[in-house]
Amino acid sequence: MAEAGKVPLSLGLTGGEAAEWPLQRYARCIPSNTRDPPGPCLEAGTAPCPTWKVFDSNEESGYLVLTIVISGHFFIFQGQTLLEGFSLIGSKDWLKIVRRVDCLLFGTTIKDKSRLFRVQFSGESKEQALEHCCSCVQKLAQYITVQVPDGNIQELQLIPGPPRATESQGKDSAKSVPRQPGSHQHSEQQQVCVTAGTGAPDGRTSLTQLAQTLLASEELPHVYEQSAWGAEELGPFLRLCLMDQNFPAFVEEVEKELKKLAGLRN
């Protein structure tokens, strides 16, 4: 996963190679005691981290944008600052996502170190923010299942217009948006999107409930992987790979394996 830093927004990608959604805010969970060794900030049955570092989208600090590119890379930018960056390919082993209305909660566990961050989508209206969230969930569903606690199924058309809601019959188990069978979805077709149900009389769900759902299961559904690449797409793809701090180590391992294979042939 890439660390926050200053990076150019121009990745050499065309509009058809990347999907973007505006965010109202991004928040990162900060462990309550930074002097302790890093570890899971949430465990089943315990209270969530008390501190969140919040980034608001504005002209002064920079507008927040969530981007998913054709290579499967996921980014969150504020202006030219990279806040999050990782590949969704194979993320089923360390990533979980929960949706609540127009918000997404992400939980990652890598080498026994866990962290949480969340985003809230923006729009000119509440309906448009929900539509942006639904569209992003459908894109994420190409790689990983998005979980929804005790949800109502909301069917949205990914074209301008208000969403239509229908009640879900199953209220005793967590809902999820399954991964999609293909990467090319037409915006004029209806997309099924899932939102969380009303966990309280005012229709709100606590962060504790979301976190418990996020960390309840060790098993995640199979990720959808796509590998249709043309030679002309290698440049932008390599630029994206170089933004991942783990990529140089991966290249070294590949070189070692290639040398082993070359030695066997000789």
UniProtKB/Swiss-Prot annotation:
Record-level GO BP terms: DNA recombination; meiotic DNA double-strand break formation; oogenesis; spermatogenesis
KW Thylakoid (keyword) present: no
Lineage top rank: taxon: Eukaryota
Region (Disordered): 157-190
GO cellular component, one term: chromosome
Region (Interaction with MEI4): 210-261
Pfam families xrefs: REC114-like
Record's keyword annotation contains Flavoprotein: no
Family matches, as InterPro entries: REC114L
Annotated localization: Chromosome
Similarity annotation: Belongs to the REC114 family.
Pathological association: Oocyte/zygote/embryo maturation arrest 10: An autosomal recessive infertility disorder due to abnormal fertilization of mature oocytes, with development of multiple pronuclei or absent pronucleus, and early embryonic arrest.
General function of this protein: Required for DNA double-strand breaks (DSBs) formation in unsynapsed regions during meiotic recombination. Probably acts by forming a complex with IHO1 and MEI4, which activates DSBs formation in unsynapsed regions, an essential step to ensure completion of synapsis. Required for spermatogenesis. Required for oogenesis.
PANTHER family from the UniProt entry: MEIOTIC RECOMBINATION PROTEIN REC114
Name the UniProt record assigns to this protein: Meiotic recombination protein REC114
